[in-house]
Each structure stands twice: as C-alpha cells, then as structure tokens.
A protein has these predicted regions:
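Low-complexity, glycine/proline/serine-enriched intrinsically disordered segments
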Residues: 17-34, 93, 101-256
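N-terminal signal-anchor transmembrane alpha helix of single-pass membrane proteins
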Residues: 1-23
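Amphipathic, heptad-repeat alpha-helical segments
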Residues: 20-64
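Extracytoplasmic/periplasmic/luminal assembly and interaction segments
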Residues: 59-79
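Amphipathic alpha-helical coiled-coil segments
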Residues: 72-87, 97-109
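Short, charged, amphipathic alpha-helical segments
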Residues: 59-66, 85-93
C-alpha cells in the first residue's frame, strides 16, 4: 500500500513542478512580448510628438497615428497575456505606417522599413488612380496623397475583410472598423474601385470571404462541383465623408 502513496506523491510533485515551469514560461513570454510592444509604442510616440502636419493628408495621417499610439498604450497597460501584448504591438505598427504616410505627404524621407502588418500581404495596394461614382458622389483611390485623397490606409484586414493600401478621398473602411461589421453595399464600391486593378489581384468574392490575394493560391471550388453561395446584397450604405480623429497639437520636426 505504501508504494501507492509514493506514486501519488511523485505524481503530485511532478504536476506541481510542471505547472510552476509553465507559469514561469508564460510569465517570461508575457514579459518579452510587453518589452517588444513597449519599444514599438515608444518609437511611435516619439514621432507623433515630433512631427507637425503641413497639409490635409499629413494632418489626417498624424491624427490616425496619434489615435493608434493612445490605443496601443491602453492595450499594453491591460495586456495580461503575450497574445494581448502582441496585439498592442500590431496597433503601434499601424501607427508607424501612418507616420510613414504623413512623412510621405510632406515630401520627407519616409524612414526605415516597418514590419508587415497582419493581413497586409493579402490586401494588395492601389497602384493607379481611379475615381468612381458611388451613391451619387465621387470616390477616389490613388497610390499617392493629394488634396483629393488625404485619407491613408496601410493595407490589411478590417472586420475580417482585406482593404488595399492606398490613399482615398474618404475612409470607406472606417464604419466597419468602428462597428466590427461591413455593410452589404461595400462590395459594390469595392468592385467599382478595384476591379481590374493590377495591385489588387482578387475579386469581390475574395474580398467578401476575407481571403484576398490568398485566394489566388487556392483551388477553384467549381473544380470540385461546389457552389460557394455568396450573396453580396444591394444595401447602398454610406460613409459620411472624410473625418479623421482629432489628435491635438503636433509640435516640432524631427527624423524618423
């Protein structure tokens, strides 16, 4: 009977040891992820407070960078897991893309390369200017900033769907960013803006199902006699102009 007690004791000790090691590993991963996110967030903060906008495009980009800086700081403060800390880093990286956009809009050196954002590699990018009529108003996409296209997006997923990197006359993705869901009419605008554009080599169905350029590597469902059954809908929706965030005062110049 005593050997059963020994086995139980050994098992309990082993379990406690493994749990302690797991807790140490989890704590170490969290600490490393927090440190990594903090470096990126501090880098973003330095740029937010050093740059001053010179035109509408840079003002919008700096406002978005400031919003991402505040959001990343809040996420980092609340991060109790490595995954949440990595999310804070992603938010800060988004902010750095907006900093890069602001510098580009002011004809400054955009600075060093920035790590790719989640979903950015499948979203594509605007590589030619295009203006379409949507719900009685013109909507423009362009590869470069201008007074007509002051709203930048770095490329990536919004509410599960890919949005190409580029400059736009209005932030047509922002309602989905705020609400976490897309209006059905967005597919109509996506088709009009990007159909046939080389930099966005995927169709509306790939936009709706969130696969983007990744769909190019997937087998066609028709080859297997399958009907994907997507219905884009016809809700015209609307996006309400090009309002950005009010970031407060930006002061000074400074390098990247």
């Amino acid at each position: 009977m005593w050997w059963l007690i020994v086995i139980v004791v050994v098992c309990v000790v082993a379990l406690l040891y493994l749990r302690a090691e797991q807790n140490k590993r989890t704590a170490r991963e969290l600490e490393e992820a927090q440190a990594d996110a903090r470096v990126t967030t501090e880098r973003l903060g330095g740029q937010v407070y050093q740059l001053s906008p010179r035109n509408e495009a840079s003002r919008q980009a700096l406002a978005d960078a400031s919003e991402r800086y505040n959001a990343a700081g809040g996420q980092l403060d609340r991060a109790d897991s490595a995954a949440k800390a990595r999310l804070a880093k992603q938010t800060a990286l988004e902010g750095l893309y907006y900093i890069r956009a602001a510098r580009t809009a002011m004809d400054m050196d955009p600075g060093p390369p920035i790590p790719t954002l989640d979903g950015q590699d499948i979203a594509g990018q605007v590589d030619q200017p295009r203006t379409v009529n949507h719900n009685g108003r013109p909507v423009t996409a362009a590869p470069t900033p201008s007074p007509l296209t002051p709203n930048y997006f770095p490329g990536g997923r919004v509410a599960g769907r890919p949005v190409p990197a580029g400059w736009y006359s209005e932030p047509w993705w922002k309602p989905a960013l705020v609400a976490g869901a897309w209006g059905a009419g967005t597919a109509i605008l996506f088709t009009a803006l990007f159909a046939g554009m080389p930099g966005v080599p995927y169709d509306t169905q790939a936009f709706e199902d969130g696969t983007g350029e990744a769909a190019l590597d997937q087998p066609n469902p028709d080859d297997f006699g399958q009907d994907p059954g997507y219905d884009a809908g016809q809700d015209p929706g609307g996006w309400g102009g090009s309002e950005g965030f009010d970031s407060g005062g930006f002061d000074g110049g400074g390098g990247f």
